[in-house]
C-alpha cells in the first residue's frame, strides 16, 4: 500500500517543474505588478503569440484565448480586482441589449443613466473616497486615517471604453453585440487595458470578427512602436526619474533655484515619456495582433497654445470627453456663460 502511494506521488523536480517559479507566474505580486516593459511580459508575449497564430483561422477560440489571457494579465497587474472588469462587462452588455429592445425614450435614458452610475460610481469610489474623506474628516473628529482602498490599475480606461459602447447604443450610433465573448474581448483587450489609449466601441468592434491579417507593414510598424515605447519608458523616463527628478524633489533645499527649475522640466519630460511610451507599446502590440488603435500623443510639447496642447496630449481622452461629455452638455451652442460652465465640467471630469 505504501509502495503504491509513493508511486503515485509526483516528484515535481524530476518532471523539471520549479514550483516556486510556477507560483510566481500564476499569482499576483503587489511588489512586482506586470508591466509591458518587464522582461517577464515580453517572454510571455512571445509564447502567447505562438498560440495566437495557431488559432489564426479559429476566430471564436482565438477570442476566448485572448480574453482569458487579458484577465490573467489584469490579475497580474491588479490582483483580485480583475472581478471589476467582469462587473463592468456583464452589466453594460446586458444594459445595451435591453436598450435595443426598449422603444420608450425615458426607459432608454434610465438604462444609460444606470450604466453611467455603475461605471462612474466604481471610478469615484476607488479614486476619490479617501480624497473626500480627508476633506470632510475635520467636520467629524478632526483625525484622518485613510481607508484601505487599493486603486485598480487602468480603471479609468476600461470604464470609459465601456461607457462609449452604452452611450453609442443609446444614441443609436451602434448596434449592440449579441455575443458576450465579443464584448468581453473588447473591454479587456490587454494592450490598452492598463494605460490606454481609450479605444471606442464603434472603432474597435468592427475589427473583432474580421479575418486575422497582419501585413508586413503592420508588423514593421508594430515592432517600431514597441521598441520606441520601451526606449521612452525604460531608458528615458526611468533614468530621469531615478537619477534626476527624485533627487531634487526629495530634497529641494539642497539644490539651487536653477537646478529646481531643471527638475521641473525633467519631470515634464519624465511623465511624457512614461505615458506616451506605454501608449506606443499598446499601439505596437495591437498591430502585431492585427488591430488598429488611434494615436494618443502628437508631440504635445511642440504646442503653441493651451488649446493646441489639449489637442495633442492624451488625444483619446480629450476627444472622448469632447464627444461624450462636452457636446452632450451643449458644447458652445448655448451662450458664453453656459460654454464656460461646460468647459469647467469637462475639465473637472477629465481629472477623474
Predicted feature locations:
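Membrane-embedded transmembrane alpha-helical bundles that form the catalytic cores
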Residues: 8-352
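Short, Lys/Arg-enriched N-terminal segments with co-localized hydrophobic residues
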Residues: 1-6
